[in-house]
């Protein structure tokens, strides 16, 4: 009987120790994931949304649903006759086509 009691206490001690370490690992993973999400959110706040001007920062466009927006530039003639370059963040046509095909595929195949 003493052997069974001693074995039971040892088993409970080992189980509680291992579960405590697992919980610590999960807590650390949760903290790391939270910090990663916060960093991504900060980067998102600094990016340029779709249809906004990106002339001064051509690589700062935000991400869309599937792809990152690209800075698309055009040459504009002002009223004084000067040609200036104006850029905006948008989805390139080949990305729009890919999103259309993926959306159509999701509707068909569920």
Swiss-Prot record:
A single Pfam family, by name? Answer: Toxin_35
Which superkingdom heads the taxonomic lineage of this protein's source?
Eukaryota
Q: Where is it made, tissue-wise?
A: Expressed by the venom gland.
UniProtKB keywords: Disulfide bond, Knottin, Secreted, Signal, Toxin
Q: What is its main location?
A: secreted
Q: Kindly list the GO molecular function terms attached to this UniProt entry.
A: toxin activity
Alphabetical list of InterPro entries matching this protein: Spider_toxin_CSTX_knottin, Spider_toxin_CSTX_Knottin_CS
**UniProt family annotation:** Belongs to the neurotoxin 19 (CSTX) family. 03 subfamily.
Q: What is this protein called?
A: U1-lycotoxin-Ls1mm
Q: Which organism is it from?
A: Lycosa singoriensis
Please spell out the taxonomic lineage of the organism that makes this protein. Answer: Eukaryota, Metazoa, Ecdysozoa, Arthropoda, Chelicerata
């Amino acid at each position: 009987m003493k052997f069974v009691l001693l074995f039971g206490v040892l088993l409970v001690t080992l189980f509680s120790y291992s579960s405590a370490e697992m919980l610590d690992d999960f807590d650390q993973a949760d903290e790391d994931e939270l910090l990663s999400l916060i960093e991504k959110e900060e980067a998102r706040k600094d990016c340029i949304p779709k249809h906004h001007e990106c002339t001064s920062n051509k690589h700062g466009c935000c991400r869309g649903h599937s792809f990152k927006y690209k800075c698309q530039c055009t040459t504009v003639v002002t009223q004084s006759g000067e040609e200036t370059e104006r850029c905006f963040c948008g989805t390139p046509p080949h990305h729009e086509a890919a999103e259309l095909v993926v959306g159509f595929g999701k509707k068909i195949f569920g």
